[in-house]
């Protein structure tokens, strides 16, 4: 039976996603460089943009999909009003729910190590 998923992303334990949505972005909008503790998929429905993932530039347009692996830095600059679908993959145990930033948030291995240290104290 289908399950209605409330906004707070309360997914059942068997789910292979931890978040998804539709973005409506305007020319000049930018998604700042960031990373996640899970994989992310962007599917472009309409519009154009320039993405950077792990330092590699990609031009995105309708029908394109950009896959970013957990821990990969990525960003987007919108060059034509854009509608896209984003989908977040499985969040590992102790994963963090947000855009994570270099110099502010620990990379995944260091994040796990900090949890282990706290647990041992």
Indicate where each model-derived feature is located.
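A short, N-terminal "cap"/entry segment at the start of jelly-roll beta-barrel domains
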Residues: 1-22, 32, 99-121
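Catalytic core of non-heme Fe(II) oxygenases with the double-stranded beta-helix
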Residues: 28-35
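Short, conserved beta-strand element in jelly-roll/cupin
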Residues: 35-51
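A cytosolic small-molecule/anion-sensing beta-strand core signal
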Residues: 45-46, 62, 80
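Ligand-binding loop in jelly-roll beta-barrel domains
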Residues: 50, 70-97
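Short acidic-glycine-tyrosine-enriched beta hairpin
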Residues: 55-71
